[in-house]
Amino acid sequence: MRAYIYDEESQLSPQDEHESSQSVSKQELEKLGVLYWSIDSIDQVNSIAIQRDYKNRDQIICSPQAMGDIYQQKLDTFFEEHLHEDEEIRWVVEGSGYFDVRDQTDQRWVRIKVEKGDLLVLPPGIFHRFTVDKDNYIKAMRLFKDEPKWVALNRSTESESNPYRKAYIEQVGKAMTMGAF
């Protein structure tokens, strides 16, 4: 995993790195409520699933071959800024991609490069987006506390006032009093 401030000036495709010179540490991600583990085996995933009460899982393959004609439509959907009312938990089994999350100012994107073995947990209420990288392939295990579902609430006035969003802002505000990045 590698995290850094997303270079907004770049005119490149969202699937490019958009590398800036500002790196973001694992500790800084934790202040945003984002959790990360480097996982070598399914046994480690199972252990975290038990600790965090993840009862269900499935797998998604995001590639032109796996998704066919709907691939670009799905990429566009995933890259639209949105939040969820549940944690978003992904363990990368193969391939790579980028999760972008809003920083504590809600003005900049923090880009998180994920690759095989990376397990990422995004908290409910955080605005984020996802895309594969230039290799156009990722296979990820999705973990869920309840029944598998993926309900995205795109950024809007309505989603800004969502109770999960408000709870997230309160949580991050408390973490930021301990030192912003």
UniProtKB/Swiss-Prot annotation:
The lineage of its organism: Eukaryota, Fungi, Dikarya, Basidiomycota, Pucciniomycotina. Residues 1-23 are annotated as: Disordered. Keywords: Amino-acid biosynthesis, Cytoplasm, Dioxygenase, Iron, Metal-binding, Methionine biosynthesis, Nickel, Nucleus, Oxidoreductase. Its cofactor is Fe(2+); Ni(2+). Belongs to the acireductone dioxygenase (ARD) family. It comes from the Eukaryota. GO terms for biological process: L-methionine salvage from methylthioadenosine; methionine metabolic process. Its EC number is 1.13.11.54, 1.13.11.53. Catalyzes 2 different reactions between oxygen and the acireductone 1,2-dihydroxy-3-keto-5-methylthiopentene (DHK-MTPene) depending upon the metal bound in the active site. Fe-containing acireductone dioxygenase (Fe-ARD) produces formate and 2-keto-4-methylthiobutyrate (KMTB), the alpha-ketoacid precursor of methionine in the methionine recycle pathway. Ni-containing acireductone dioxygenase (Ni-ARD) produces methylthiopropionate, carbon monoxide and formate, and does not lie on the methionine recycle pathway. This is Acireductone dioxygenase. Residues 1-10 have a biased composition (Acidic residues). Its main location: cytoplasm.
